Amino acid sequence: MAGKKIAGVLGATGSVGQRFILLLANHPHFELKVLGASSRSAGKKYVDAVNWKQTDLLPESATDIIVSECKSEFFKECDIVFSGLDADYAGAIEKEFMEAGIAIVSNAKNYRREQDVPLIVPVVNPEHLDIVAQKLDTAKAQGKPRPGFIICISNCSTAGLVAPLKPLIEKFGPIDALTTTTLQAISGAGFSPGVPGIDILDNIIPYIGGEEDKMEWETKKILAPLAEDKTHVKLLTPEEIKVSAQCNRVAVSDGHTECISLRFKNRPAPSVEQVKTCLKEYVCDAYKLGCHSAPKQTIHVLEQPDRPQPRLDRNRDSGYGVSVGRIREDPLLDFKMVVLSHNTIIGAAGSGVLIAEILLARNLI
Amino acid sequence: MAGKKIAGVLGATGSVGQRFILLLANHPHFELKVLGASSRSAGKKYVDAVNWKQTDLLPESATDIIVSECKSEFFKECDIVFSGLDADYAGAIEKEFMEAGIAIVSNAKNYRREQDVPLIVPVVNPEHLDIVAQKLDTAKAQGKPRPGFIICISNCSTAGLVAPLKPLIEKFGPIDALTTTTLQAISGAGFSPGVPGIDILDNIIPYIGGEEDKMEWETKKILAPLAEDKTHVKLLTPEEIKVSAQCNRVAVSDGHTECISLRFKNRPAPSVEQVKTCLKEYVCDAYKLGCHSAPKQTIHVLEQPDRPQPRLDRNRDSGYGVSVGRIREDPLLDFKMVVLSHNTIIGAAGSGVLIAEILLARNLI
Amino acid sequence: MAGKKIAGVLGATGSVGQRFILLLANHPHFELKVLGASSRSAGKKYVDAVNWKQTDLLPESATDIIVSECKSEFFKECDIVFSGLDADYAGAIEKEFMEAGIAIVSNAKNYRREQDVPLIVPVVNPEHLDIVAQKLDTAKAQGKPRPGFIICISNCSTAGLVAPLKPLIEKFGPIDALTTTTLQAISGAGFSPGVPGIDILDNIIPYIGGEEDKMEWETKKILAPLAEDKTHVKLLTPEEIKVSAQCNRVAVSDGHTECISLRFKNRPAPSVEQVKTCLKEYVCDAYKLGCHSAPKQTIHVLEQPDRPQPRLDRNRDSGYGVSVGRIREDPLLDFKMVVLSHNTIIGAAGSGVLIAEILLARNLI
Amino acid sequence: MAGKKIAGVLGATGSVGQRFILLLANHPHFELKVLGASSRSAGKKYVDAVNWKQTDLLPESATDIIVSECKSEFFKECDIVFSGLDADYAGAIEKEFMEAGIAIVSNAKNYRREQDVPLIVPVVNPEHLDIVAQKLDTAKAQGKPRPGFIICISNCSTAGLVAPLKPLIEKFGPIDALTTTTLQAISGAGFSPGVPGIDILDNIIPYIGGEEDKMEWETKKILAPLAEDKTHVKLLTPEEIKVSAQCNRVAVSDGHTECISLRFKNRPAPSVEQVKTCLKEYVCDAYKLGCHSAPKQTIHVLEQPDRPQPRLDRNRDSGYGVSVGRIREDPLLDFKMVVLSHNTIIGAAGSGVLIAEILLARNLI
């Protein structure tokens, strides 16, 4: 596979790791070579180490890879490493990899709030990757060896929340009030053990530890402008935008649904039709860059009264497309709408792969 | 059963009708004698006419009742008639019953918006029954025969929404901004055929026809004051309160969960602890009147981070208690909280029975 | 699309019809041109007529086809017509089509028991299509116009049941005792309205009308030999094989699981390993014929203790592969095993398409 | 509470322990005083130690009990101890309790196969308690202190399987062939963590570790006669009865459904009606003894074509009643039928409490 970048996956036996492996199988630009997991799995063939729970079969390309421990020494040949590590382990491991000069795209929450770490939803704020470009250029200019770096994938439900906001803000100006109530899929809680069956059969759980804080905080970083020197992002202040999230777990395997309400700062607010048109016409930069996984239609605006629904819409554009429906006026704010995003693809591993494709397109790896 | 009032049920084979029958079985004050359903069922024993779908067994008291057609002539002996009729049939039938002098407590939406028809959540606005008292007194004063009347049970999710608001408004003054996103049980859609299995397995439906409009409108009637002459309710105006609802169907059999946010008009807003204390201390008038089904604890304030949950909390006080949890500050409005109510008991048939108990306590039947 | 056969679908808006349309979209040998449905849908664009419930999006190739009534006059150009009609309508309509000289592959039960109508599971008994070949040859020899014919797709769970039996019987001789207990997906009950949500949430239904009789009868036709004159099938007698089925509906969208036990007539019975090897080595005739949809691995033998499972295995070979696991000795009969088949693909519409591919390969259309 | 026996529960925070606590709350004959759990919970109030997952609220009687470690020294005052311990811990702990002279009714599998330990389904083989009576009498006759003893509750699905067989065997003689395919509720797998949500949403699992062996073995002990000297049970031999089980997990919270087939040794076999009548007329000894929890109707024979169903029938007689439906002839054996039993009541904790009531009625505690 001449010309392909070598990829590694950390946390390869976990739910996000499994999804990375699926997405990297037969990828035109990346060749999956190194899989890292716990010492319990290290030394085994991947097929023997993993409890595969994806509905797609385990790709042959990963079956016989011998699992390594999560140490940078085993990942030296990698141009890019995708981390699906649990937060308990990600902090130390990813730091060690970065200090070893490795480029990491991480789904863990550990470094999301670091000023100089881009927190990216690839269909929303790819320009924040300038932080990495600026870091590489600086090192180069200083004759230093090429530094490693960490790029963080956003929280899964935040990805769905901000996706439609980007084009709306670009067109109609700032949003100063935003609420979301989520109905989140259980795959978001992973498999070890994940959401217990007894808790989600004939039930919902009105609580996901830390999720609301993540959504309320991360939205203010993702939608924020870069500092002039491109070394960091200038967080939006509470005065600029108030975000309120309420998160629930429901009996859905994949696909987070969010009931959002928003208010534009500028008066008068646009019409429902203007909002719909704006969303339909939005083409993300990743698509313009020709990235393999970038959805042609970033936001699918649905007209049926009862859509989007996870079962029927989560796989649009292979899970990279975000669906928005029931766009209507809100008696309290300006608009109410229902947003659906595939929580393990555009909400996690998929974003990671698309971020890597953007890095490749910008020669940052 | 000396001293018991005679009760009838309309729409006896439907989901709400079945719940009325369960609640009226062995009731200390009501004796179920007459069951009305479609012509298809009329003439049959109830046990042979109904496709019983309740998890409690069909009460023996109803088993052998011969089903009648829904005509007032068959219900003459009834002191009170509970209507679980579908809206398509309720309008004409309930009108005919009222004009025949019969007292009806109806779960149908048909007359909810009529000025002189009380729309009651028995743990919230029993005082609106003064409209009926005033009507009966007027007829008596004019020497006219005792008139029939219709009292409407609110929409199921509205009942859960307004239950905690009543004590808060009494204590801290008006609420001027209110949002709710619901996760509603499928029993709310009835059984003929109700929500199709294929639509709710590994899925949610972000739409319930007419529900948002009902919640936004009915809240403004239930929380409104009576007119001085007690002939009607003075609806709250949009200036007084803005209500925004987003309704979803989830894979739960019974129990509507609602993620609500609210803002008090008066500044400063109370503290979280003050809100909790207010809710805990609230005792509904129905309990003070000694009504059989009135919950001792109207609002159960739960402290666990992940409660209330339908599976674990819907049956508090046999479904008459409303649970509130996760009471916390809202970055946009004042407070966010999760409310759970049993949609076919305090949200429908249960409210009907409790309304009848209040009527009995006030000698209005 | 030169060289492609023209296809039509009857019952196009139903669940089986929708699946035919998905499978025929971009098919290398068939071009979908005519869609038939009820008079309510006739005259509308398909996209406006259907309530699309498949997890894959509605193919563009079907979107704008104007729906016809189910009359042969509108299907004259069709080389093959796939019928997903409900049994209530299939009888008369399919007869009219056959008498108009049209070739029909039908999923309806109406003609399955007719002596001269082949009942086909394409990976099991394609040789029964000789009945059609013989009928066409006879007409040709008699100088008559080319007759229409009906080929029936088997009952969905019977397809899964007989798939592993074919290779076992070929290798180890007759099976004289066969039991199956099914755990069947709700998509098998269609969408109008299909299994009610309230019946399948936190529940199973130990009954599927007519299913056990279908399984016990159809098995004896599918596994039977052709009569010498190839005009019909000589049903297996109860002395030759006793079949006992118990059918249940479970909360699974697609994929029927069956717990089967079987006994070979010949003694001694083979070993577990011999059974596994036999199943692994089996290659169906359709694959040998080069049919587009034929699975390379007809029977997937799984070694994990808890497999097959619908969620993880139903899509093997795009739903044409049948999975068998937990092959073990049975204290009462010879062997017990778990069989999983995709009930709307190899169990219904998929089989129909594969049958048509076999007809094409044998120049019977 | 004068006259009540003192009860203790081991494994009090687990799923079976929680069910024991619910059943013992307000029990007329037992007063719950001592709760044992892991060292992690010991010393805490029960309400603070447990993650309560029952749909009924935590009984006040257990709320403030300080949890003890599972050592007999803390249970000295107990007349009876109910063990919901996990098998990993039950072996050593229950042995220590027995050797300390304590009477234990255990839901763990550890001692079920010991010759001198009765394995009891209280509505089926209470006579096997003679082993305990005989042991107590012997000790008494030898002037030894009163010995402790262990009585085992059967495997949950075995309880449902054997319940209808007892009356049939009594009336029509031995059963020599018995098959069962189970559709088992997830509560049977406990809560730590129990069946993962991702494995049971839109899925079934055709495997429950060790379950089939338990059902096939335990049936032969429960249905067997006592040895003449009443010191043990003479297991039924494979020549006397062949039992074949296939076990599956389905998306049901409580209530195991079993599709069973059986053949009587004696010819001719009875008729379907004779089987129904026999089951209807059966009254278990526990009811004759006046035991509090004994179901008046041990076997509920249901006539609807699609019953029993877990959601509608599991709570018959508060979960102590077993429902049997679809009794019909089997083309291979004699009869097929569907059996439903509440897996945590008559299948576990409920049986334990009923066993204790029988012991009490027989003055064995």
Swiss-Prot record, chains A, B, C, D:
The modification Phosphothreonine is found at T13. Its main location: cytoplasm. Present with 18400 molecules/cell in log phase SD medium. The modification Phosphoserine is found at S318, S323. One of its GO terms (biological process) is threonine biosynthetic process. Homotetramer. It is found in: Cytoplasm, Cytosol; Nucleus. GO terms for molecular function: aspartate-semialdehyde dehydrogenase activity; NAD binding; NADP binding; protein dimerization activity. Its EC number is 1.2.1.11. Induction: By high concentrations of Met (general AA biosynthesis control). One of its GO terms (cellular component) is cytoplasm. Keywords: Amino-acid biosynthesis, Cytoplasm, Methionine biosynthesis, NADP, Nucleus, Oxidoreductase, Phosphoprotein, Threonine biosynthesis. The keyword Hydrolase does not apply. It catalyses: L-aspartate 4-semialdehyde + phosphate + NADP(+) = 4-phospho-L-aspartate + NADPH + H(+). NADP(+) binds at T13, G14, S15, V16, S38, S41, L85, D86, G188, N343. InterPro entries: ASADH-related (IPR051823), Asp-semialdehyde_DH_CS (IPR000319), Asp_semi-ald_DH_pep-lack (IPR005676), Asp_semialdehyde_DH (IPR012080), NAD(P)-bd_dom_sf (IPR036291), Semialdehyde_DH_NAD-bd (IPR000534), Semialdhyde_DH_dimer_dom (IPR012280). The gene is HOM2. It is an enzyme of class 1 (oxidoreductase). It comes from Saccharomyces cerevisiae (strain ATCC 204508 / S288c). The active site is at C156 (acyl-thioester intermediate), H256 (proton acceptor). Belongs to the aspartate-semialdehyde dehydrogenase family. Catalyzes the NADPH-dependent formation of L-aspartate 4-semialdehyde (L-ASA) by the reductive dephosphorylation of 4-phospho-L-aspartate. Mediates the second step in the biosynthesis of amino acids that derive from aspartate (the aspartate family of amino acids), including methioinine and threonine, the latter of which is a precursor to isoleucine. This is Aspartate-semialdehyde dehydrogenase. Pathway: Amino-acid biosynthesis; L-methionine biosynthesis via de novo pathway; L-homoserine from L-aspartate: step 2/3; Amino-acid biosynthesis; L-threonine biosynthesis; L-threonine from L-aspartate: step 2/5.
